[in-house]
Amino acid sequence: MFSFNLLTIVSSIVNLLALAWIIKRYFLGAIIRIMNERREKIEAAMKEAEKKLQEAEDLRKQREAQLAQARDEAAKIIKEAVDTAEKMKRDITAKAEEEAEKIIVKAHEIATAERKRVLETAKKEVLAFSRLIIKEFFKRFLPVEAEELLISQFAESLDSAIANIKSDNIEEVKFISPDNVSSQLKKKIEDKLRSLLPGNWKFIFDVDPSIGLGFKLFIGEFLIDHSLDYHLSQIYETIREVENI
């Protein structure tokens, strides 16, 4: 019995060793290779997974950065739009105020010009009407020689007006009346002027019906105006100043 058992054991060992050799010879290398390949695949898969995770993380960070940049750009665009709108509002307001100021100034200028035109027209009408009335008064209620008498009296009052005129370079003196006066009055006026203005100047007597009454005296470039129009204008300007027109 003991011999059988030993033989069986030895046989089993031999079989086991043979099986081990066969497994090692034909199967162990393949198994190890398969296991190595699986391990490498698993490692490669893990590395790929880690790579994908890193790429995903990078993409997430990149997207967050892009979103942050987009938010900043959007905020910048909104701020620029608000600033532009505010500037446009200020510019429009300033331009509107400037245009309004120009309109007011223009309206004031137009009103002033129109007022001046109306006053000038009224002045001309008043002067013309006053001249007509005074001329008609002279014709109806005063003798014919009254106008010459008036001119003569005006001429007699020339002393103070001519006193300050320098007569050194006077070449011409012109006396203008509304109507032709007598030669006697002309002589009287010329003598009066020559007594006041020394020198060899030329004397000219002229007629201008638009004067109305009185006379105009040109001594060189200097004018002594004793015409009806002049005195009526002075009265009119005085009235305007008093009434603060």
Curated annotation (Swiss-Prot):
Function (record text): F(1)F(0) ATP synthase produces ATP from ADP in the presence of a proton or sodium gradient. F-type ATPases consist of two structural domains, F(1) containing the extramembraneous catalytic core and F(0) containing the membrane proton channel, linked together by a central stalk and a peripheral stalk. During catalysis, ATP synthesis in the catalytic domain of F(1) is coupled via a rotary mechanism of the central stalk subunits to proton translocation. Component of the F(0) channel, it forms part of the peripheral stalk, linking F(1) to F(0).
Protein name (record): ATP synthase subunit b
Membrane topology (UniProt): Single-pass membrane protein
SUPFAM superfamilies found in the cross-reference section: F1F0 ATP synthase subunit B, membrane domain
Keyword Ion transport: yes
Gene: atpF
Subunit structure: F-type ATPases have 2 components, F(1) - the catalytic core - and F(0) - the membrane proton channel. F(1) has five subunits: alpha(3), beta(3), gamma(1), delta(1), epsilon(1). F(0) has three main subunits: a(1), b(2) and c(10-14). The alpha and beta chains form an alternating ring which encloses part of the gamma chain. F(1) is attached to F(0) by a central stalk formed by the gamma and epsilon chains, while a peripheral stalk is formed by the delta and b chains.
Subcellular localization(s) per the UniProt record: Cell inner membrane
GO MF: proton-transporting ATP synthase activity, rotational mechanism; proton-transporting ATPase activity, rotational mechanism
Family: Belongs to the ATPase B chain family.
Superkingdom field: Bacteria
Transmembrane segments: 3-23
Keywords: ATP synthesis, Cell inner membrane, Cell membrane, CF(0), Hydrogen ion transport, Ion transport, Membrane, Transmembrane, Transmembrane helix, Transport
GO cellular component: plasma membrane; proton-transporting ATP synthase complex
Pfam family, one: ATP-synt_B
InterPro entries reported in the protein's UniProt record: ATP_synth_B-like_membr_sf, ATP_synth_b/b'su_bac/chlpt, ATP_synth_F0_bsu_bac, ATP_synthase_B_chain
